[in-house]
């Protein structure tokens, strides 16, 4: 319907333009202006056939059809001469009353017409609605929450307790500024929240406003700069004027890197000067208001490294707070928050879900429970069970199941052997990521998956950890070669080889884990004109060759080790593959049970230590120790 309406509007506009063009072009007479002397000469030579006099202008037509225009001076006898020579002379009727108004209107009509088209296009670009909106270029597009203040509080923010403590003094200042002013202190003018996408930067800003019970003014960094020059700076001024009217309040600028990118001599991308003007105005405004005005600026970004240093100096964004991804305890608390409005069955173990989601942010966890709720609703269930949560987790981490994909029995066997090789390495090595389940059901881009879950969150890795990870990655390829020979290896190990090589390269060139190369790191720089591609600098060809040799040595050693392990456990591995082909998905416990039939014990390889139980035990031990100390004191 809207498309048809727009078609008719444009058809009318184009039609009106054609009519106006024909109207004005039709009224024009194409004549050549000449001097009075030339006309007199033509009259005397008898070359003029017709003349039309319009006030002080005469249109002369020669016998050869040429039209000439001449301006007649007062009291001229040119008309009498033309009559004497037999020229037909006509005098146009005098202009009717109001004719000059018509002429003025007709002369201005094209200009008014195109102004109307321009206004129409501006209204279309601004989304219609208010007629004046198209001209409010300099007005800020910030959303102001005054009566409807953010309902989010610190109860809705979990997993970042240290960050919450850090921002509580901002809330106290907004509630009672006199308390700080008595001691001569001032709160930070600006707070920069930075971290990976989804960690809760925007949610935390809303919670601060909700706890302080003050107006919340929200704007995106991309709302400042548009197609018109000077609009960004004007919108920054209007934003702070709006904030002063509603003080005390919080200004929240999301994705500030869109406008706060570091200034430089080399413009990268278009609109460079306009963006710098907007940034300069933002710097001036943040210097121009005093903390006694009751305005706190909170900004969020995923890229603090590209922000202008002038924006980050004390006096503007005094406090910079990093919001990390939640650890296992934080994920558990976040899951509890998002589970408040969900109907969970009794079998749902949020502690297990927290342990099974390393690297997940708050947004990821919310999406996980939402996906589980949708799956439960699709199945017609009244509650969300652990089955739906695990299925949702598999969909997010590994992709959708492609059960309808046709795979030949021979290919299926190779996939099963490949995945069994991965699982075997994970079980016999000292890798901290324990095997959870093995599946040969195609998911996403993968034809099979071996899922591993970490026992605990790790922040640093030693050389042994990295060797074990490379061993697990090469386990699938090693199993293929042992079972089918060198000519039977497949393309299924492409991603495994890439990840293993990248890990080995980092060990040698970044983390100094090679005895031959030594504890050095290759300096690398990114070129902004090549899409951020990094290149090594100040590195000799000999050193690069040594690095390549060490990477190859690490990969080769771990690959040979993986093949030896597969050879050692070849018979029980065949039985595992057979079971995997029958069931398509098996758990770690089922894998271990098959090995037990061959007299091989993989003790505690599937046991996942309960971090939460460890935490509880440590808390109990602390309480016991404190009670013992009290008794000793008494």
UniProtKB/Swiss-Prot annotation:
Keywords: ATP-binding, Cell inner membrane, Cell membrane, Hydrolase, Membrane, Metal-binding, Metalloprotease, Nucleotide-binding, Protease, Transmembrane, Transmembrane helix, Zinc. Zn(2+) binds at residues 418, 422, 496. Its EC number is 3.4.24.-. One of its GO terms (biological process) is proteolysis. Residues 615-634 are annotated as: Disordered. ATP binds at residues 195-202. This is ATP-dependent zinc metalloprotease FtsH. It comes from Aquifex aeolicus (strain VF5). The gene is ftsH.
């Amino acid at each position: 319907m809207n498309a048809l309406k727009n078609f008719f509007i444009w058809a009318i506009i184009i039609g009106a333009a054609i009519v106006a063009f024909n109207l004005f072009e039709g009224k024009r007479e194409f004549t050549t202006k000449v001097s009075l002397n030339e006309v007199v000469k033509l009259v005397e030579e008898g070359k003029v056939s017709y003349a039309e006099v319009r006030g002080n202008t005469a249109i002369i037509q020669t016998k050869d059809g040429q039209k000439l225009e001449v301006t007649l001076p007062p009291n001229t006898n040119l008309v009498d001469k033309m009559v004497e020579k037999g020229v037909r002379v006509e005098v146009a009727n005098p202009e009717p009353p109001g004719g000059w108004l018509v002429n003025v209107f007709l002369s201005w009509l094209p200009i008014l017409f195109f102004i109307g088209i321009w206004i129409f296009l501006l209204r279309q670009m601004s989304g219609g609605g208010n007629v004046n909106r198209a001209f409010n270029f300099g007005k800020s597009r910030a959303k102001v929450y005054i009566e409807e203040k953010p309902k989010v509080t610190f109860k809705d923010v979990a997993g970042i307790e240290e960050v919450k403590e850090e921002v509580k003094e901002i809330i106290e200042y907004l509630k009672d500024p006199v308390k700080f002013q008595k001691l001569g202190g001032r709160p930070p003018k600006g707070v920069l929240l930075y971290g990976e996408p989804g960690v809760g930067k925007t949610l935390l800003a809303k919670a601060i406003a909700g706890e302080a019970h003050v107006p919340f003014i929200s704007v995106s960094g991309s709302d400042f700069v548009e197609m018109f020059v000077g609009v960004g700076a004007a919108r920054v001024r209007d934003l702070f004027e709006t904030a002063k009217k509603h003080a005390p309040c919080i200004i929240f600028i999301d994705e500030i890197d869109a406008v706060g990118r570091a200034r430089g001599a080399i413009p990268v991308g278009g609109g460079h000067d306009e963006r710098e003007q907007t940034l300069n105005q933002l710097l001036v405004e943040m210097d121009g208001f005093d903390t006694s005005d009751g305005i706190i600026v909170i900004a969020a970004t995923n890229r603090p490294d590209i922000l202008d240093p002038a924006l980050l100096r004390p006096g503007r964004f005094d406090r910079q707070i990093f919001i990390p991804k939640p650890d296992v305890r934080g994920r558990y608390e976040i899951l509890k928050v998002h589970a408040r409005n969900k109907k969970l069955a009794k079998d749902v173990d949020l502690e297990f879900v927290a342990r099974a989601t390393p690297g997940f942010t708050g947004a990821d966890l919310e999406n996980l429970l939402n996906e589980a709720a949708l799956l439960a609703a699709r199945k017609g269930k009244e509650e969300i069970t652990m089955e739906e949560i695990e299925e949702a987790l598999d969909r997010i981490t590994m992709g959708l199941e492609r059960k309808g994909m046709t795979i030949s029995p021979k290919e299926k066997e190779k996939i099963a052997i490949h995945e069994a090789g991965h699982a075997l390495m994970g079980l016999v090595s000292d890798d901290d990521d324990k095997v959870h389940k093995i599946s040969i059901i195609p998911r996403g881009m993968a034809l099979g998956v071996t899922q591993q879950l970490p026992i605990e969150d790790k922040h640093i890795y030693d050389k042994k950890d990295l060797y074990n990870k490379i061993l697990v990655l090469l386990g699938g390829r090693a199993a293929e070669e042992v079972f089918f020979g060198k000519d039977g290896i497949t393309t299924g190990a492409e991603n495994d080889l890439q990840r293993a090589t990248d890990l080995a390269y980092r060990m040698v060139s970044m983390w100094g884990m090679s005895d031959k190369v030594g504890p050095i790191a290759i300096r690398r720089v990114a070129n902004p004109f090549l899409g951020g591609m990094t290149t090594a600098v100040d590195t000799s060809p000999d050193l690069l060759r040594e690095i390549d040799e060490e990477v190859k040595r690490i990969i080769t050693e771990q690959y040979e080790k993986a093949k030896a392990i597969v050879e050692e456990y070849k018979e029980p591995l065949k039985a595992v593959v057979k079971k995997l082909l029958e069931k398509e998905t098996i758990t770690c416990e089922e894998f271990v049970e098959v090995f037990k039939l061959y007299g091989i014990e993989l003790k505690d390889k599937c046991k996942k230590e309960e971090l939460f139980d460890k935490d509880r035990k440590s808390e109990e031990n602390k309480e016991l120790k404190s009670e013992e100390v009290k008794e000793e004191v008494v």
